[in-house]
Amino acid sequence: MALEMTQRQGIVVWLYSLRQVKQLRRYGLVYYTSKRMKYVYLYVDADQAPAVIERLKKLHYVKRVTRSQRPMLDMEFGALAELANQETATKAALKE
């Protein structure tokens, strides 16, 4: 019995009013709700994401729907850490 990880896609749903947040639970996992900016962050299965986005766009209380850009981002920061260390070393050398 092996644990299989399902790929998930984050979806940002901008609303006119937050009264319908409970209704969004049927489309996916409500991860975060911003009361001030009136948006909800949902997680859905990656293979079902396009269909869910189309269904959400048709709802009258939804202003707009956008996909999360996180899967497209490079999450390897090792090269950036080395670059920061080099810059710190050069600044220290210049001060001396």
UniProtKB/Swiss-Prot annotation:
Sorted UniProt keywords: Cytoplasm
Compartments, as annotated in UniProt: Cytoplasm
GO cellular component terms given for this protein: cytoplasm
Protein's name according to its UniProt entry: UPF0298 protein LCA_1075
Family: Belongs to the UPF0298 family.
HAMAP family: UPF0298
Major location (coarse): cytoplasm
Alphabetized InterPro entries for the sequence: DUF2129
